[in-house]
């Protein structure tokens, strides 16, 4: 969604309804040296995902074209090298090949679920009483945790990249 006015209206409508929404945030990292990462267990993807999935509410992550690449063909998805500097015409791999940075911008998207604590009555099960019962959660509620989660996910990616650089013995972060 690019229209900030529409976005604000949607958030306000959710707030008035006492409901929440999930969201997808895109994170980018520029200037990551080609070769940063490891080809197997400590790939950029696995290291970043390990930290990002530790953020409450995260339900998914995709790098580059992500799930759209799964519906594509290699002839359309391959990032063809255009010059001797390794520049590619596209960035479907999100700046990562085989777990290593390829010199392109690293691009990933993180999906957050809607916050479950909403300002509407919900049905739950009372295990003590042995029957369904209404649940009301008083207090302040985030309408969209992705708004706060974006900052946490960006920090997690930065930590993951710094960790990979430092473990490789290259302190030029």
Where is each model-derived feature located?
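Internal helix-turn-beta structural module
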Residues: 107, 115-173
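Glycine-rich, mobile lid/loop segments that gate access to catalytic sites or pores
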Residues: 1-40
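Flexible, glycine/charged-enriched surface loops at secondary-structure junctions
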Residues: 14-25, 57-69, 168-173
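A translation/RNA-centric and nucleic-acid-associated enzymatic feature enriched
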Residues: 58-135
């Amino acid at each position: 969604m690019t229209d900030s006015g529409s976005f604000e209206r949607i958030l306000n409508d959710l707030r008035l309804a006492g409901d929440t929404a999930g969201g997808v945030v895109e994170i980018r990292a520029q200037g990551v040296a080609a070769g940063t990462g490891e080809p197997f267990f400590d790939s950029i993807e696995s290291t970043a995902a390990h930290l990002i999935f530790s953020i409450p509410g995260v339900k998914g992550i995709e790098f580059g074209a992500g799930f759209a690449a799964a519906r594509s063909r290699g002839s359309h998805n391959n990032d063809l090298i255009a010059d001797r500097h390794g520049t590619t015409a596209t960035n479907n791999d999100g700046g990562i090949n085989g777990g290593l940075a390829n010199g392109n911008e690293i691009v990933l998207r993180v999906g957050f679920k809607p916050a479950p604590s909403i300002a509407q009555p919900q049905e739950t099960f009372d295990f003590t009483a042995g029957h369904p019962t209404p649940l009301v959660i008083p207090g302040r509620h985030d309408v969209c945790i992705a708004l706060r989660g974006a900052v946490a996910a960006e920090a997690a990616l930065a930590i993951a990249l710094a960790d990979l650089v430092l473990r490789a013995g290259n302190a030029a972060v």
